UniProtKB/Swiss-Prot annotation:
<dbReference type="InterPro" id="IPR013783">
    <property type="entry name" value="Ig-like_fold"/>
</dbReference>
<dbReference type="GO" id="GO:0010214">
    <property type="term" value="P:seed coat development"/>
</dbReference>
<dbReference type="InterPro" id="IPR001764">
    <property type="entry name" value="Glyco_hydro_3_N"/>
</dbReference>
<feature type="signal peptide">
    <location>
        <begin position="1"/>
        <end position="30"/>
    </location>
</feature>
<dbReference type="Pfam" id="PF01915">
    <property type="entry name" value="Glyco_hydro_3_C"/>
</dbReference>
<keyword id="KW-0964">Secreted</keyword>
<keyword id="KW-0272">Extracellular matrix</keyword>
<dbReference type="GO" id="GO:0046556">
    <property type="term" value="F:alpha-L-arabinofuranosidase activity"/>
</dbReference>
<keyword id="KW-0378">Hydrolase</keyword>
<dbReference type="Pfam" id="PF00933">
    <property type="entry name" value="Glyco_hydro_3"/>
</dbReference>
<keyword id="KW-0325">Glycoprotein</keyword>
<dbReference type="GO" id="GO:0045493">
    <property type="term" value="P:xylan catabolic process"/>
</dbReference>
<dbReference type="GO" id="GO:0009044">
    <property type="term" value="F:xylan 1,4-beta-xylosidase activity"/>
</dbReference>
<dbReference type="InterPro" id="IPR002772">
    <property type="entry name" value="Glyco_hydro_3_C"/>
</dbReference>
<dbReference type="InterPro" id="IPR044993">
    <property type="entry name" value="BXL"/>
</dbReference>
<dbReference type="InterPro" id="IPR036881">
    <property type="entry name" value="Glyco_hydro_3_C_sf"/>
</dbReference>
<feature type="glycosylation site" description="N-linked (GlcNAc...) asparagine">
    <location>
        <position position="658"/>
    </location>
</feature>
Length: 774
């Protein structure tokens, strides 16, 4: 959000002037030297907070003791002020690295020695790879480039990424930024990407500081007159525990993330950035966050000025800080916190607690060590390297999903398909491929450019832009299809259709796109391949059922190398192995389900959400994706058929014996003592192509009286495996009763149902009898 927009939100002439002054200070200080405690500075080199060999918590307290109240307050906001008398420069906390270094936030700038950075596929596309090691490796590369740019003075070290909200509704404009609809996938993605970004340095040190956002139940931007600034998400404890909060908990527990961002919306009547239970009690208390909590930009201003949650701005400042907020993206706390102290709404100690969390992260990053630290050797030569570009291409290969391939029409042959018509509004795009929250890419390969490496191309856009408001270009597109040996239609969406602040109203292709596909398919003398670029699902039932459309590919937003990856898959240089990370619903789904309804489970005429709870027809299901080869599954070893759950005490046993739900609370069990049940899944490649395959393990719980359970099945594990043609690979998944077989009851408590649990691995089914050990 720009400084101008921030000023508009405050709504007071005096404050507007202050805001612009703060913005001017930010703009002049953002490229100051990015570390304090320069050993050449005789004023600071002897200060205790500058001694890298002193424990960080001691250094933080020493620095806090030297700051005035006003200096502390000016460091509660993203454009933190300099403290020249202590040799501390200003710092911009807000940088973005969703799928590469971005210049969306003010913390990173491109130009000079750093004209761009590697732009990987949008997250929804990378998620479709279901490859945890790939996710972590992308994070590692992004952090290399971040450190290089930091060393060059054009970027910071605090990145407000990843976005791990659940893709609850297919219309959400920001669904493209997320790992999809499944909370376990989002949780694994969150932990993997955060580990890649932050590194694994000894001594609790950080390479860069990641931030998981937007906590919590945020997945509506602007729909049917309801926007994120005014939306109150009414969410049950059950849905919070088993859906919305799962990725954030994993971010903190498994990923050890350095920051969590609270969201604009309210949850059950409270702004998330002023909710002590969500912030102080849950993130910092239960989950033990080792880091800071930051607001989404201007969230504190939003809950005062737009949600009218408090009577005065000083009360808003106090409520947010006392709830556990440490840093405000925006000027609000810099302006109103001192007044809150004077009115007795806050103490200086409250401010110290918040500031200690941000200073600790900066010290873990080495920003007070007086030098650039262990990554000082990284520079311009380490950005956009050949290896990084290759990883961007490989990520696109792994994430692109083959949805239809009638009569094995793909791959095309360069010998037989020498002329290819390349048609559609997305056929020669570049920036569209990198989605939102992107930076300046190293270089682009559009679909047209990629296909041109394999065949002579006849190019026609067909319509002007994805809105496709007219059919004037259809005739030329049909003529090209008649002449070519094969036709590739590159259709779909872009940021004008789905984006932050822009939710969709329907799921169909925009404008005349469907008509263009149908007419070109009728005219084409060769096979027709439909390629879709989008973040959210599209109802393409017409193409799925049209025999003249031989193949359908979903490319998501495939990144800077997207065109090369699409072409490689079409011509068989790469074998598609992606799987859909979200359900593709039919158009009539949106007529039944308002975006404002947060309930996950089906009830009455309400069909539920995501594959876990939705009961209805789909265009393509979650986890669907074809390959040029075929795979079969078998169980290499006979798994256990029974698991016994031991109880932690006699009272718990009595509870279970008298329970009508036939389940045990996870909190009443000895989870650490349970034997894990290994599943050895043998994956055989029975086709002619080498390929990658995702092994999904779903659990279907017994129906045994747990009220409001309503789950069809839930993913408990997934593994990516590469198998050569004619070969086999064995994948081991260890099933943990507490972790994998538990469900959440209507009160938000995790329970293990007793009875027969069904595990689904492809076409395989295995039943486990779970019973109490009394």
């Amino acid at each position: 959000m720009s400084c101008y927009n921030k000023a508009l939100l405050i709504g007071n002439k005096v404050v507007v002037i202050l805001v612009f002054l703060l913005c001017l200070v930010h703009s002049s200080e953002s490229l100051r030297p990015l570390f304090a405690c320069d050993p050449a500075n005789g004023l600071t080199r002897t200060l205790r907070f500058c001694r890298a060999n002193v424990p960080i918590h001691v250094r933080v307290q020493d620095l806090l003791g030297r700051l005035t109240l006003q200096e502390k307050i000016r460091n509660l906001v993203n454009n933190a002020a300099a403290v020249p008398r202590l040799g501390i420069g200003g710092y911009e906390w807000w940088s973005e690295a969703l799928h590469g270094i971005s210049d969306v936030g003010p913390g990173a700038k491109f130009g000079g020695a750093f004209p761009g950075a590697t732009s990987f596929p949008q997250v929804i596309t990378t998620a479709a790879s279901f490859n945890q090691s790939l996710w972590e490796e992308i994070g590692r590369v992004v952090s290399d480039e971040a450190r290089a740019m930091y060393n060059g003075g054009v970027a910071g070290l605090t990145y407000w990424s990843p976005n791990v909200n659940i893709l609850r509704d297919p219309r959400w404009g920001r669904g493209q930024e997320t790992p999809g609809e499944d909370p376990i996938v989002a949780a694994k993605y969150a932990a993997s990407y955060v580990r890649g970004l932050q590194g694994t340095a000894a001594g609790n040190r950080l390479k860069v500081a990641a931030c998981c956002k937007h906590y919590t139940a945020y997945d509506l931007d602007n729909w049917n007159g309801v926007d994120r600034f005014h939306f109150n998400a009414k969410v049950t404890q059950q849905d919070l525990e088993d859906t919305y909060n799962v990725p954030f908990k994993s971010c903190v527990y498994e990923g050890k993330v350095a920051s969590v961002m609270c969201s604009y919306n309210q949850v059950n009547g409270k702004p998330t950035c002023a909710d002590e239970n969500l912030l102080k009690n849950t993130i910092r208390g239960q989950w033990r966050l080792n880091g800071y909590i930051v607001s989404d930009c201007d969230s504190v201003d939003v809950f005062f000025n737009q949600q009218h949650y408090t009577s005065t701005p000083e009360e808003a400042a106090a409520r947010s800080i006392k709830a556990g907020l440490d840093l405000d993206c925006g000027p609000f706390l810099a302006i109103f916190t001192e007044g809150a102290v004077k009115k007795g709404l806050l103490t200086e100690n409250d401010i110290n607690l918040a500031l200690a969390n941000t200073l600790t992260v900066q010290m873990r990053l080495g920003m007070f060590d007086g030098n650039l630290g262990p990554y000082a050797n990284l520079g311009p030569r380490d950005v956009c390297t050949p290896a990084h570009k290759h990883l961007a291409l490989e990520a696109a290969h792994q994430g692109i999903v083959l949805l239809k391939n009638s009569a094995r029409s793909l791959p095309l042959s360069p010998r037989r398909h020498r002329t290819v018509a390349v048609i559609g509004p997305n056929s020669d795009v570049t920036e569209t491929m990198i989605g939102n929250y992107a930076g300046k890419a190293c270089a682009y390969t559009s679909p047209l450019q990629g296909i041109s490496r394999y065949a002579r191309t006849l190019h026609q856009a067909g319509c002007a832009g994805v809105a496709c408001k007219g059919n004037q270009g259809f005739g030329a597109a049909e003529a090209a299809a008649r002449e070519a040996d094969a036709t590739v239609l590159v259709m779909g969406l872009d940021q004008s259709i789905e984006a932050e602040t822009r939710d969709r109203t329907g799921l169909l292709l925009p404008g005349y796109q469907q008509d263009l596909v149908t007419r070109v398919a009728q005219a084409s003398r060769g096979p027709v391949i439909l390629v879709l670029m989008s973040g959210g699902p599209i109802d393409v039932t017409f193409a799925k059922n049209d025999p003249r459309v031989a193949a359908i590919i979903w490319a998501g937003y495939p990144g800077q190398a997207g065109g090369a990856a699409i072409a490689n898959i079409i011509f068989g240089a790469a074998n598609p192995g992606g799987k859909l990370p979200m359900t593709w619903y039919p158009q009539d789904y949106v007529a039944k389900v308002p975006m404002t309804v947060m309930a996950m489970r089906a009830s009455g005429n309400y069909p539920g959400r995501t594959y876990r709870f939705y009961k209805g027809p789909v265009v393509f299901p979650f986890g669907f994706g074809l390959s040029y080869t075929t795979f079969t599954h078998s169980l290499a070893k006979s798994p256990l058929a029974q698991l016994s759950v031991s109880l932690s005490n006699l009272n718990s046993a009595n509870t279970i014996l008298n329970s009508s739900s036939h389940s045990i609370k996870v909190s009443h069990t000895n989870c650490n003592s349970f034997p894990k049940m290994p599943l050895h899944v043998e994956v055989s490649n029975t086709g002619e192509f080498d390929g990658t395959h995702t092994v999904f393990v779903f659990a279907e719980p017994p129906i045994n009286g747990i009220k409001g359970l309503g789950v069809n099945k839930q993913l408990i594990a997934f593994e990516k495996v590469h198998v050569m043609a004619g070969a086999k690979q064995t994948v081991q998944v260890d099933v943990d009763a507490c972790k994998h077989l538990g469900v959440v009851d209507e009160y938000g408590k995790r329970r293990i149902p007793m009875g027969e649990h069904k595990l689904h691995i492809g076409d395989l089914k295995h039943t486990i009898l779970v019973q109490p050990q009394l």
